[in-house]
């Protein structure tokens, strides 16, 4: 059975923005070498090593460290990552803050974030996650209280609510998954530390890319960054 759809033809408006993409590697023709006039360099495995003055160091396809342009002047912190033998991240260090990740198999069960303050004291934040029978995260325990994840039709985490149903965190994304805003009474604490957001995937906050289904996909570039087997 066929259907006929009627379309109208209008005049295209003026482009709001033009962003040039360049592919100048003759040996790897689909490798993005420049985005909006900013060059991107790679190692022999196709991992990006420099972009916007930032330096990325890789061990195979595991990102070991990310150093922003301003790190040398002390205006930004470097990111250092540790992994287990299966390539799952177990620790993230950003300046004086260390976050440890705990798993049951491949399920992230909890995180412990410890910050060493200037006076030598430490501040600790703990998150413990609960899952349903299908392995989908449904709740998080933060400071002894449970909060529950709400998703939209695309499985994006859009809210966290407390036991009364009140919204404590709300996320807004654009169509590419870039986080536009975080609001709510716990936005700066639970909202910031919660690793589950777009599509419900665990956040990989590399500042350059986010991990989606095994491919490193840059939100700004709207394309796959790494060639993964």
Show which residues each predicted segment covers.
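Aromatic-rich beta-strand edge motifs centered on tyrosine
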Residues: 1-7, 13-31, 38-47, 54-64, ...
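Short, hydrophobic/aromatic-rich segments at coil-to-beta transitions
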Residues: 86-91, 107-110, 194-197, 209
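Acidic, proline/serine/threonine- and glycine-rich low-complexity intrinsically disordered segments
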Residues: 209-229
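A cross-taxa feature marking solvent-exposed loop/turn segments within ectodomains of secreted
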Residues: 74-76, 166, 206, 219
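Beta-turn initiation residues at beta-strand->coil junctions
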Residues: 3-12, 33-38, 49-54, 65-72, ...
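Tryptophan-centered short beta-strand motifs
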Residues: 32, 75, 122-124, 223-227
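A motif-centric feature for acidic-aromatic and gly/ser/thr-rich catalytic loops and repeats
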Residues: 19-25, 142-212
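Predominantly a core beta-strand signature of beta-propeller blades
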Residues: 137, 179, 223-225
């Amino acid at each position: 059975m066929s259907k006929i759809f009627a379309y109208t033809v209008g005049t295209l408006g003026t482009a709001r923005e033009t962003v040039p993409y360049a592919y100048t590697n003759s040996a790897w023709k689909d490798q993005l070498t420049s985005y909006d006039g900013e060059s991107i360099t790679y190692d022999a495995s196709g991992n990006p090593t420099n972009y916007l003055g930032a330096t990325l160091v890789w061990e195979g396809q595991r990102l070991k460290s990310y150093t922003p342009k301003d790190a040398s002047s002390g205006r930004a912190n470097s990111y250092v990552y540790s992994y287990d033998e299966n390539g799952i991240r177990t620790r993230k260090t950003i300046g004086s803050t260390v976050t440890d990740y705990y798993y049951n198999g491949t399920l992230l069960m909890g995180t412990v974030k410890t910050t060493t303050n200037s006076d030598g004291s430490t501040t600790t934040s703990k998150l413990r996650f609960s899952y349903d029978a299908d392995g989908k995260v449904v709740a998080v325990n933060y400071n002894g209280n449970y909060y529950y994840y709400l998703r939209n039709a695309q499985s994006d985490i859009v809210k966290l609510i407390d036991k009364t149903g009140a919204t404590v965190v709300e996320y807004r994304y654009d169509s590419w998954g870039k986080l536009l805003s975080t609001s709510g009474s716990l936005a700066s604490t639970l909202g910031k530390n919660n690793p589950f957001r777009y599509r419900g995937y665990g956040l990989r906050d590399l500042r350059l890319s986010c991990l989606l289904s095994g491919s490193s996909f840059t939100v700004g570039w709207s394309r796959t960054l790494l060639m993964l087997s």
